[in-house]
C-alpha cells in the first residue's frame, strides 16, 4: 500500500551540509519525493507541529531550534513510506538508540538536534502534511 509521510530535514542537518546525503538515501530506498521546499519554519506551524510536547521542559528550546534556521520539508510516497523512512532515520537519540547505517546513527550527536523528523503514523502524516503542505491535504 502506498503511503505518504512528512519528512523534515532539520536546521542542524542543513547547517552541517547533509541535505544531499539525506535526500540520496531517501531516493536509494525507493521512496518518491512528491514535494520539497527549503524554508524557515514559521512559529505557528512549528507550534502546531510539536503541539503534543507543549508544557514539557524541552518545548521552548525545541521551537527555538526548529525555527532558528532553514530546514527542508518534504512529502515522501511509497509502499510503507512511514516505516521505511523511520528505518532510514534511526532511533531518536543518535548516540544511544540509532545504529550505524542510519541517518542519525551516522551523523547525529544530540537527541533534540537529531537531523530529521518523520511522521510516526498515518494519522500524524496526514496532520503534518496538512500543516506544511496544505495543497496536499485534500489529495
UniProtKB/Swiss-Prot annotation:
Record key words, sorted: ATP-binding, Cytoplasm, Kinase, Magnesium, Metal-binding, Nucleotide metabolism, Nucleotide-binding, Phosphoprotein, Transferase
Cofactors named for this entry: Mg(2+)
Cytoplasm listed as a keyword: yes
Compartmental location: Cytoplasm
Enzymatic reactions: a 2'-deoxyribonucleoside 5'-diphosphate + ATP = a 2'-deoxyribonucleoside 5'-triphosphate + ADP; a ribonucleoside 5'-diphosphate + ATP = a ribonucleoside 5'-triphosphate + ADP
Binding annotation for ATP: 10, 58, 86, 92, 104, 114
Enzyme Commission numbers on file: 2.7.4.6
Family under the similarity heading: Belongs to the NDK family.
Protein name: Nucleoside diphosphate kinase
Species in which this protein is naturally found: Rhodococcus opacus (strain B4)
Source lineage: Bacteria, Bacillati, Actinomycetota, Actinomycetes, Mycobacteriales
Amino acid at each position: 500500500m502506498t503511503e505518504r509521510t512528512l519528512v523534515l530535514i532539520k536546521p542542524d542537518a542543513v547547517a552541517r551540509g547533509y541535505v544531499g546525503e539525506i535526500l540520496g538515501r531517501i531516493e536509494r530506498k525507493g521512496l518518491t519525493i512528491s514535494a520539497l521546499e527549503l524554508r524557515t519554519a514559521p512559529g505557528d506551524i512549528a507550534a502546531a507541529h510539536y503541539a503534543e510536547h507543549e508544557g514539557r521542559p524541552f518545548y521552548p528550546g525545541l521551537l527555538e531550534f526548529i525555527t532558528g534556521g532553514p530546514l527542508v520539508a518534504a512529502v515522501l510516497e511509497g509502499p510503507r513510506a512511514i516505516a521505511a523512512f523511520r528505518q532510514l532515520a534511526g532511533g531518536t537519540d543518535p548516540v544511544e538508540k540509532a545504529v550505524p547505517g542510519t541517518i542519525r546513527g551516522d551523523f547525529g550527536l544530540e537527541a533534540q538536534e537529531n537531523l530529521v523528523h518523520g511522521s510516526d503514523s498515518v494519522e500524524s502524516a496526514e496532520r503534518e502534511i496538512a500543516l506544511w503542505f496544505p495543497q496536499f491535504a485534500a489529495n
